[in-house]
Amino acid sequence: MTKVLIWLASGDREKLMPGVIWGVNAKRNKWVDEVRVIVFGESEKTLLHDTELFGMVQEIQGALFCRFVAEKNGTAEQLEKRGAKVDYVGQPIAKAIAEGFTVLTF
């Protein structure tokens, strides 16, 4: 079973785009058995203001935005209003690694 965790951390749209596109295509075309997405750090702000990328990330069901970072940046409420799932991500990351997910960071 092949499982991938895409960890979006960059605030640069051009760096995020390959990870988001790959994740969406991997999910649609069943390239791997499971795809999860963690949105962390500066990428949260970038996605909040980039409707296209935000929508693509939301296509990957279960995408999780970091609550700690979002609260620190004052964006948690805005993200939730747009439909993002905002929660603490430390434990989900550790669990995914323990479950054998390959982590791809963008």
Predicted regions and their residues:
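Residues at the starts of beta-strands that form the adenosine-phosphate
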Residues: K3, R28, D33-R36, G62
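Histidine-anchored nucleotide/phosphate-binding helix
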Residues: K15-N29
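Short, solvent-exposed amphipathic alpha-helical segments in soluble enzyme
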Residues: I21-N25, F54, E80-K81
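Short internal beta-strands
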Residues: G23, E34-F40, A63-V69
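Conserved PLP-enzyme active-site core in the AAT-like
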Residues: E34, L48-E52
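A glycine-rich helix N-cap at a beta->alpha junction
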Residues: E52-L79
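C-terminal structural segments of small proteins and small subunits
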Residues: Q78-F106
